[in-house]
Amino acid sequence: MSNLVIVESPSKAKTIGKYLGPDYTVKASMGHLRDLPKSTMGVDLEADFEPKYVAVAGKEDIISDLKKAAKNADTVYLATDPDREGEAISWHLMHLLGLDESKTRRVTFNEITQKVVQQSIASPRAIHQSLVDAQQARRVLDRIVGYQLSPLLWKKVRRGLSAGRVQSVATRLVVDRENEIRAFEPKEYWSLDVELARQGKAGGFVARYWGDTKKRELENQAQVQQVLDAIADKPFTVTSVKRADKKRSAAPPFTTSTLQQEASRKLNMTPKRTMAVAQQLYEGVDVAGEGTLGLITYMRTDSLRLSNEAMADAASFIRSRYGDSYYYGKPHVFKTKSSAQDAHEAIRPTHVELDPERIQSSLTREQYRLYKLIWSRFLASQMANAVYDTVAIDTQCAGHTFRSTHQSLKFSGFVAVYEEGRDDEAEAVGSPLPDLQEGEQALCTNTKPEQHFTQPPARYTEATLVKAMEEKGVGRPSTYASIVSTIQDREYVNKTDKRLAPTALGEVVTQLMMERFQDIIDVEFTANMESRLDDVEAGKQNWKALLGEFYGQFHQEMVDAEAALEGVRLKVPDEVTEEICEVCGKNMVVKIGRFGKFLACPGFPECTNTKPIVEKMPGSCPKCGSTILKRKSKRGYAYYACERGTECGFMSWDVPTANDCPKCGQTLFKKSGRGRMKPFCINEACEDFLPEDKRGYYKKAESKSAEEKPAKKTKKKGTSK
């Protein structure tokens, strides 16, 4: 019996093929094979929003190969990812390949392990049309908004702009935060620390002003001086000593959102890169001594659920490696929020016994670091609470209370494996305190008043923006990474020192949207639309009825906006830089030309000075050790050169990385382009040197000599073909 299994990627095909016998052929579709056309909207607005799907250009050979394989198979298993997108890919495959429903099966894998793959093949199902419809509804919604709104932005703001339904809301979040920062008015406050010495005993300690009869802030220097005058030359008395054990429980295992946040904080990985590496770990990696293994469960999920088997495996591993006292005592179950799609588990390792160090040699640096993060977080979630010994001591003088606090780790529990990162500053632990007793006297040896001002809300990082989107219901696990990436790619938002700020363009477009398309830019409206798409998936809402309701209002807003903006052209303010024009002394501004951004003098046309924008790269020049700069050729191609220019002479088309060669210590480079690029050494004196012909460049076809070229056919006058 012949069976065909179709998945999205070759790596996934390789892993699954290992678990199935010779009766199964596993092939990859390489993603979507059918989609809306790129050149037109592809949605018939007059025919109940019927999508006009076409085969994806450039995939004709794949389609032909799959059709041939499907024709010769007795059963076809569609094994694409277990979410809306995966369900839609399977549905498109069935229609595009002309598969017979009676011999077509749908299978999904929450994890790609031998047990799960074989169980899924043994218990297939039909395609869930409600999941497909939810994906179609989102796709058509986004296409309508993009294709109708983008031309308006071209005409009224700048050519080449594009608008997106959810990306517009994400940009607004960044713009709103920037406006909060601008409107923020700092308020003064003071802290007052006193250094105290015990009377007749060794050991001093520091206490901070807390209040009088109740906690209060010192708002200005005058209030501080009142306290200083009151306590001058007076003894302090210890009025309260409170000791307690404070327990801290582990964070739950990762969801998509929390994985992206933590990878951003701890690994400095963008959400987009995090998902790309997680996809590699899910689909399968060649592990020495084990073969190809899927190392983590499906990475697009908002569920905190763990299988009983996974929790039992974790319990066994914890007891074996750390001892019984480090286990939580029972399966630690975390409550999933009501809006979560609970079809999947949380993100966890598929084989907890494969600890990161054991398989490190089989993984890339990124894979290892992300796998270690996922493995540690999962294991910690099933471990005992950490216990801290805390002490709080109050001392009083002249009716004023000063407090000292300290905490120390008493039992590490889950902290032995993992501790969650933070976006804000960690709570001060305080210095160790002497063994003070109530009623004990102390003398003040020094005072330290300090002025402070309240700080504005911080700009979003990629991590905190993902967190805000999740909290507000904007987007879903499958879309967070692409949204954060898109608003930067389209230059509505810039990232500087890991913080996101709106560009002048982003603010102009957001203001236009807020004035003319209030629903599209509204956070609540967008969150409600996500909920209604969930209803489509659950079979509670007809997807075309949802589109009809949305389009009626959106179309009217489009008509009104066109009328209101007739003859209007919105100006985007130039971005002013710190770069000074050496000709006239003005601050240069950023302009956009044929080959991208460049610096120009705002004094044009009197001053025509321009400069390329220079971007510093990681690593150092392999010839002289100076900084490497990213530059652009006259044709707009990026290359990398030493900051010393012709004095040094180094340049390369390859991209410098932040990693050094383990053999010679020079900066490693990688081939430019998308996808997984393995770094290599370009130092010819190094034993790890990789010659240019092995770096994966495309070879230009050698030009044929005149003798080899076929003669051109000439057409005689007066003759016809």
Regions found by a protein language model. Name each.
Residues 1-136, 148, 211, 330, ...:
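Intrinsically disordered, low-complexity regulatory segments
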Residues 2-4, 15, 150, 183, ...:
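Basic, low-complexity terminal or inter-domain segments flanking catalytic cores
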Residues 14-37, 168-217, 381-431, 593:
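Structured, non-catalytic alpha/beta "coupling" segments that mediate domain-domain communication
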Residues 15-19, 65, 88-96, 116-120, ...:
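Alpha-helical scaffold elements adjacent to nucleotide-binding pockets in ATP/GTP-utilizing enzyme cores
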Residues 112-194, 244:
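C-terminal or mid-to-C-terminal helical accessory/interaction module adjacent to the motor/catalytic core
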Residues 138-149, 166, 196-198, 246-258, ...:
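Core structural elements
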Residues 214-252, 440:
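Metal- or metallocofactor-binding catalytic centers and their adjacent structured scaffolds
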Residues 258-271, 466-476:
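Short helix-coil junctions and helix-kink-helix linkers
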